[in-house]
């Protein structure tokens, strides 16, 4: 190992939302002199406006700091930021793979949460040295001793010498830097071997093209070299390499053990895939770094412009977002009810919400979205297998042998008094109980196997409202399982509205259908003729509501008189309404679509 590498430390910070990760990062950067005090109020690493607002980290931003330690040497510290949310699990695993150590930041007032657990286990799998940091000790309700014990009990790492800090007040920051230097091992690697570099993120720059954030494992990379991507085999010529001081700062070369960026006029972010290995095209390494996998979208939904003329703008906006977000997939889609739009695939619910919010905010678009759906495997009677991401493409029931749906293993951490409510919720959502363990007297870890279909809707909101926000939740895909699923169609005035079709479990179909038709009845305005709203499975109608017609009082002119006269007028009116119903078209307002997405909120 070279002399130079002994002075490099690559680390990440693992923390639950709001446990103070970004603030701690700011303090470390400030302490090593890269920022003036003035710049420190704004969280350096969270670039997107949305990130700051929701207090979550979505796009990663690494940063390099130079720290003069107490032993008199200067160390290069590379902080690789990790997104904390479950949708971005794969991105987290790649960030973790680029490090040798991790700071585990736990809030002194709250203790460990489910997402932290998932990420810590991932870090332990990658053999990272974990340094526990107990943050927010300045708060009156802080209980650091209790949290230390919890870290030892739950994760099983020694928390005796956990560091006590308050990032907000700047307490204990020096100790954290010393611990990074003394407890986290230097990187291993050999700069004389062929180049191997792990891509842990990428973003798109209008001038330089797609820029890959890399951790160089072996070898050296410098401008003018030809590099090859392992997963696609494409070759590019390096135009610039550099470090992060949070902003891009070009250097002459990146060597083994270092973290930096590579620009090679790559036109598309899809060519710099997270987790891929970059090697020297002229002297390639024999095999790539382990752990690369294609990112597969889990949740799909249709996105349509509320105003049909915005279609081109929506397309452009999605293309721009895709430049920076290779995990977003979309294809054109048409719906009889909503016109032209796109079928988009996302990593998870949060990802979907963020993309929708960014489209509405940054591109001023007014959107209609359909209910989210997952990918089902449909086994047909002729032996074909379909991957179904859109309920409207489901084959007729006679051609289906059976359907499988994706299953996840959910880990829920919850205070003991809410266990009953959470278990009830999971059972409600077709969850299969796997086990529970008490982490301490007051908190329980529940494990359930659940269909992804039941989670993507609003499970997280329901969980939060039943536990007053105290539960935390994480899930991991387990595979596919056969299930009794049917396609629920909604007919309005006898016509199928494709955008409202959904795939549901047979046992829940009736209840769901009832709710939908009632909701639509409230949201569709009365017309001059009556409108039947029906829910059907195949050709069998299982629920119906009718929106009554607006009608004139045709008997107003009749004073007394014969009953046959009245009958004649009423019959005539009825005839007219019937004819009108045959030719009339029903206007379905946007609210009607939106109301169906929010069906379960009222419980």
Swiss-Prot record:
Membrane topology, record value: Peripheral membrane protein
Domain of life: Bacteria
A Pfam family recorded for this sequence: EFG_III
CDD domains: EF4_II (cd03699), EF4_III (cd16260), LepA (cd01890), lepA_C (cd03709)
Family annotation (SMART domains): EFG_C (SM00838)
UniProt record, GO biological process: positive regulation of translation
SUPFAM superfamilies for this protein: EF-G C-terminal domain-like, P-loop containing nucleoside triphosphate hydrolases, Translation proteins
EC number, as in UniProt: 3.6.5.n1
Gene Ontology annotations for the cellular component aspect, listed alphabetically: plasma membrane
Catalytic activity field: GTP + H2O = GDP + phosphate + H(+)
Protein name: Elongation factor 4
Origin species: Thermoanaerobacter sp. (strain X514)
Phylogenetic lineage: Bacteria, Bacillati, Bacillota, Clostridia, Thermoanaerobacterales
Chain's gene name: lepA
């Amino acid at each position: 190992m070279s002399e130079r590498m002994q002075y490099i430390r690559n680390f990440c910070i693992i923390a639950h939302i709001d446990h103070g990760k970004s603030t701690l990062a700011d303090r470390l950067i400030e302490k090593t002199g890269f920022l003036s005090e003035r710049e420190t109020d704004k969280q350096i690493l969270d670039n997107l406006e949305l990130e700051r607002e929701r207090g979550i980290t979505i796009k990663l931003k690494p940063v390099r700091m130079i720290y003069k330690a107490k032993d008199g040497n200067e160390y290069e510290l590379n902080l690789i930021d990790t997104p904390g949310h479950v949708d971005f699990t794969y991105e987290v695993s790649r960030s973790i793979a680029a490090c040798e150590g991790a700071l585990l930041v736990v809030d002194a007032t709250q203790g460990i949460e489910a997402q932290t657990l998932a990420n810590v286990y991932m870090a332990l799998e990658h053999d990272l040295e974990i340094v526990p940091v107990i943050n927010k000790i300045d708060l009156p309700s802080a209980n650091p001793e209790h949290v230390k014990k919890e870290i030892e009990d739950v994760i099983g790492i020694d928390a005796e010498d956990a560091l006590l800090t308050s990032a907000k007040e700047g307490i204990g920051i020096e100790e954290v830097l010393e611990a990074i230097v003394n407890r986290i091992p230097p990187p291993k690697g050999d700069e004389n071997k062929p180049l191997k570099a792990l891509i842990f993120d990428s973003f798109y720059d209008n001038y330089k093209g797609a820029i890959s954030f890399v951790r160089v494992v072996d070898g050296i990379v410098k401008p003018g070299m030809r590099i090859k991507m392992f997963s696609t085999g494409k070759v590019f010529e390096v135009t610039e390499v550099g470090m992060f001081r949070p902003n891009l700062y070009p250097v002459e070369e990146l060597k083994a053990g270092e973290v930096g960026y590579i620009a090679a006029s790559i036109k598309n972010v899809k060519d710099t895939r997270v987790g891929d290995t970059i090697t020297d095209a002229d002297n390639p390494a024999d095999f790539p770094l382990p752990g690369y996998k294609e990112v597969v979208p889990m949740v799909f939904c249709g996105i349509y412009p509320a105003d049909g003329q915005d279609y081109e703008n929506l397309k452009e906006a999605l293309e721009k977002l895709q430049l920076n977000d290779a995990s977003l997939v979309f294809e054109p889609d048409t719906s009889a009810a909503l016109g032209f739009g796109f079928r988009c695939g996302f990593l998870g619910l949060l990802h979907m919400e963020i993309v929708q919010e960014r489209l509405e905010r940054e591109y001023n678009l007014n959107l209609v979205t359909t209910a989210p759906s997952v990918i089902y495997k449909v086994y047909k009677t002729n032996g074909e297998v379909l991957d179904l991401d859109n309920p409207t493409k489901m084959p007729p029931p006679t051609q289906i042998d059976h359907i499988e749906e994706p299953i996840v293993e959910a880990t829920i951490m919850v205070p003991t008094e809410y266990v009953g409510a959470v278990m009830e919720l999971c059972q409600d959502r077709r969850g299969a109980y796997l086990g529970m363990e008490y982490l301490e007297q007051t908190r329980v870890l529940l494990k359930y196997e659940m269909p992804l279909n039941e989670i993507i809707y609003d499970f997280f909101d329901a969980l939060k409202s039943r536990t007053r926000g105290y539960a935390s939740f994480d899930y991991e895909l387990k595979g596919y399982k056969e299930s009794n699923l049917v396609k629920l169609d909604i007919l309005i005035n006898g016509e199928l509205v494709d955008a409202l079709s959904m795939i549901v479990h047979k046992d829940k179909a009736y209840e769901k259908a009832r709710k939908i038709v009632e909701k639509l009845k409230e949201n569709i305005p009365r017309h001059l003729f009556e409108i039947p709203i029906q829910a059907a499975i195949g050709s069998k109608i299982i629920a119906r509501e009718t929106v009554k017609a607006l009608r004139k009082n045709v008997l107003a002119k009749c004073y007394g008189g014969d009953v046959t006269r009245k009958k004649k007028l009423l019959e005539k009116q009825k005839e007219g309404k019937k004819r009108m119903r045959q030719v009339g078209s029903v206007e379905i307002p946007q609210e009607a679509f939106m109301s169906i997405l929010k069906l379960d909120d009222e419980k």
